[in-house]
């Protein structure tokens, strides 16, 4: 699935964050260990998305993020830390840079730690 600014705007309209959708402001940076924990938790809840560069309080403005300038580096870092692949997409939204972590669901009968 190609993630577009329009898709981000649809997600922003959500009334609240869910087990499968997290918004994080992360204007300048985001703790990698915290990111790994979010990836594991979302995988265990059936998969979903983490968006960096979007305020988590409504109206969920795009604030942009400078976190993880090396997308390939964080992609491999996540795999090495948690043992499964997370797709990382950088979107140039008109209001700022947004990074989306698309977390797959864990295989049935297993749990990630």
Segments predicted by a language model, with ranges:
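Conserved N-terminal catalytic/coupling substructures associated with nucleotide/phosphate chemistry
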Residues: 1-113
């Amino acid at each position: 699935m190609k993630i577009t600014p329009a898709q981000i705007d649809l997600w922003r309209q959500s009334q609240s964050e869910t087990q499968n959708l997290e918004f994080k402001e992360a204007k300048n940076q985001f703790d990698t260990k915290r990111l790994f924990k979010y990836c594991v938790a979302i995988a265990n809840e059936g998969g979903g998305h983490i968006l960096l560069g979007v305020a988590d309080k409504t109206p969920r403005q795009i604030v942009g993020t400078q976190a993880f300038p090396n997308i390939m580096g964080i992609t491999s870092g996540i795999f090495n830390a948690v043992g499964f692949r997370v797709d990382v997409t950088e979107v140039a939204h008109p209001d700022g840079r947004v990074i989306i972590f698309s977390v797959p669901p864990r295989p049935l009968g297993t749990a990630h730690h």
